[in-house]
Structure formats: C-alpha cells, structure tokens
Amino acid sequence: MVEADRPGKLFIGGLNLETDEKSLEATFGKYGRISEVLLMKDRETNKSRGFAFITFESPADAKAAVRDMNGKSLDGKAIKVAQATKPAFESGRRGPPLSRSRGRSRGLRGARGGGPRRPPSRGGPADDGGYAGDFDLRPSRAPLPMKRGPPPPRRAGPPPKRAAPSGPARSGSGGGMRGRAPAARGRDGYEGPPRRDPPPPRRDPYLGSREGGYSPRDGYSSRDYSSARDARDFAPSPREYTYRDYGHSSARDECPSRGYGDRDGYGGRDRDYADHPSGGSYRDPFESYGDPRSAAPARGPPPSYGGGGGRYEEYRGCSPDAYGGGRDGYAGGRSERYSGGRDRVGRADRGLPQSVERGCPPPRESYSRSGRKVPRGGGRLGSRSERGGGGGRSRY
C-alpha cells in the first residue's frame, strides 16, 4: 500500500551495485527537491543491495520522476521506479512479531485448551467405569484406574474368587505375577478398558513363554475366566453359549465357557483369540507348561506364533509332552486358575484324563479353527463333537 504519510517516497529498484546515494541524488534531483535518499546496503559488507528509496518534498515531483525514470538506464542498468509501498523489510519486521505473538497466543490457547481436551480422552476409559473425573487432572491416569479397580462394588465379590484360584496356581510362577493379575483384575473393575485388554495378551504370549509361568496370560485369563465366573452371576450370555453346548458341568464350563468358550461361543472373538492370544499365547502356555516336563521342543514354536497350523503340527509332535505331561500340568494349573476349587473338585471326581481333555480341546478347537483339522484320533474329534453337540459334555 502507498505510504500515506510519505506520498513523495519512491522505490528505485534494479540499481547497479556501484550506484551510490550521490549519483541517485544527482539523477533524481532534477525533478524536484529531494528530502531523503536511502540506499539499502548489506549490513555486513556495506555494499548496495540494488535498491533505494528517494523521498521528494513534493508528491508531484515524485510522480514526474516515476513517469520519466521508470525503465530508464542508470549506470548501465535499467531501473524500476515506482511509488514506494510499505517496504517488505519493514512489514517483515513488523509483521512477524504480530504473527509470532498470534501464533504464541494460539499455541498457548491450544496448549491450554488442548491440555484439558486431551486428558478427558485419556481419562475417558476411567470415566466409563464411573471413576471420578479427577483422574483427568493427574498424569498417571491409566495406572490409577488399575489401582482403584478392585474397590468397585460390582466386582468386590468376584476378585476374591479370582484370587483364590489364581493364588495357588500362580504360586509356582512367582509373586510378580500375582501383582500383575490384581492389576488385571483392577482393569476388570470397569468396563471400558477391557476393550484395551486384548492388546496386552498379544504382548503377553511372549512374556508368558519367556517366564515359563506365563503369568501375564494368567492375569489375562484370570481376568477372562474369572469374569466367566462373574458371568455366572451377571452375564448370562456366556452361559447361554456354554451351558447350552456343554451342560452345567461347572469346572468344565468354567474353562471352556469364558476363555475357550469365547472361542466356541462368540464367533468373532473366537477367530480373534484363536489367531492371536490362543494361537500364540494359549499355545505358548501349553509350551511353557509342557516345558517343565519336557517341552524343550515345545519351547521352540513361540516364534512361529502367528500360524496356528504349523504350531499345531508342532503340538502334534510334542503332544505327549506338551499335551500329555504339559496338558496335565496345564489342565491342573490352568484350570485350577480358571475354575478354582470347583475345577479341582471336578478333577478329583473325573481324574486326570478328563482334566487333560478339559485342558486340551480348546486349543484343538482353536487349531481346527485355523483350518488344520488334522484328525487327532477320537479324542480330538470327540472333543470337538462334544463341544458342538453338548450331549457329550453333559455326560461329565
């Protein structure tokens, strides 16, 4: 924009770098009296930057100079002469501070606004469970719900149940696992984060197989299976699937109903779990349980984690150990974890073979789901048919 305060100011561009203020004044002085000649120079070298500003006392003289001198040659270079606008360097100096302050205020506003905005999203899961919004003000939002998970009255009863079975089973794997399972239980305390739970299983399989006790899996499965126990109290849908299929055999319902029953009953979760947690971590558990007995071969498979089929073949290879010894150990430890004293009583009645069968079929189901329906004898097909039919299960 034309400088209103200096209407007689002209911009002269395209100057020869040798042109100085004196030559400019001599050239433009013939149009009128010049009040100022400003040749822009480089600060460091003090050389001309090739443009200048000349201010005439009379705007009319300035217009005449523009009319006559624009495009003319000065010191061998064609120059541009025009009415001066707010110079870029001035507006640049003035502008950036404004924009910077604007940006800063925006940034502060964003930080101030975004801060509060972001925490609710992080605290959202906690709010799902009815936790107080004060979590939003604290940095450690996720851990706090976990710590406060057990208190919610809904689950106040079930966690002890969980603790009872998981305690004995986990005693072999160490106290750290006990710590983790309570955290998991805490997550059970509210409904939102269980949606976040499936990711931990995917990490857990490796932890589990590494630790040998795969207690994180216990944490997860105790979450899952004990919630099946809770499901008996307030989640009829698992029962509908499992009891319809298997009859009311408590311990056996317990293990299949929630963890493996999820695979059988809930189609979507079945595939998901069979591919990931069950494919990797339920199988890894078998390996880690079989490992104490003689699953050194079974230890190898965890890396092949994703492909249920290959893993299943390896299970067939080490099935005497992983499914035999490990299966008993697994069914013993694992089903004790999941079904607690009830399972132990049932196992005493039924004897180990059925606990074996109890521990074993679910993975078979998951493997057969992965597309490898390798006939494993009557036990495998029988167990699957029992799962499907329900009559076979109710026999026990």
Curated annotation (Swiss-Prot):
Gene that encodes the chain: RBMX
Gene Ontology annotations for the cellular component aspect, listed alphabetically: catalytic step 2 spliceosome; euchromatin; extracellular exosome; nucleus; spliceosomal complex; supraspliceosomal complex
Location of the region described as Necessary for the association to nascent RNAPII transcripts and nuclear localization in the Swiss-Prot/TrEMBL record: 186-236
UniProt modified residues of type N-acetylmethionine: M1
Region (Disordered): 84-396
Composition-biased stretches (Gly residues): 323-332
PTM remark: O-glycosylated. Arg-185 is dimethylated, probably to asymmetric dimethylarginine.
Subunit: Homomultimer. Found in the supraspliceosome complex. Identified in the spliceosome C complex. Forms a complex with ILF2, ILF3, YLPM1, KHDRBS1, NCOA5 and PPP1CA. Interacts with CLK2, KHDRBS2, KHDRBS3, SAFB/SAFB1, TRA2B and YTHDC1. Interacts with ERAP1; the interaction is RNA-independent.
Residue segments, region Necessary for RNA-binding: 336-396
Protein name: RNA-binding motif protein, X chromosome
Cross-link Glycyl lysine isopeptide (Lys-Gly) (interchain with G-Cter in SUMO2) residue location(s): K22, K80, K86
Biased composition annotated in UniProt, kind: Pro residues: 148-162
Lineage of the organism: Eukaryota, Metazoa, Chordata, Craniata, Vertebrata
